[in-house]
């Protein structure tokens, strides 16, 4: 079966966009529901073992980005996040290049950015607007080996990583976009 690009502004493209936007919204809601469940069920810095020696639910917060980078820079992180979303919206069709999986990939990233941005805006323990911390709770490890612990993360982080990975993979396996006549002449 030959995989073809989706034609811009076609019913197929609108259907793909609708489905990927729906997935984006569902994941953003699931992210917040799971974070609320953890906040209400597990005391801060505590854990509930799900699979002994491998997987725990651990309630922690992260005042920065991935791995604690840019700690305490909530406004800057929000500004960067919103700039990324705006750029993705402006260049959405160009970035997708008609490949179905790229629509989903980009909107997975948007979903994760929205989920973590919500935390930065509304989950402030000090009552300051836009000074919140992201709730992380998924904790994987191998036994009690100190170097075999992955930093805790959440549904939004997962959506971002899967979206970025899918987009990169798509760029490796899909052909380059065809150049139009003007681009061919200048090359």
Sequence positions of predicted segments:
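Alpha-helical transmembrane bundles and membrane-interface segments of multipass inner-membrane proteins
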Residues: 1-187
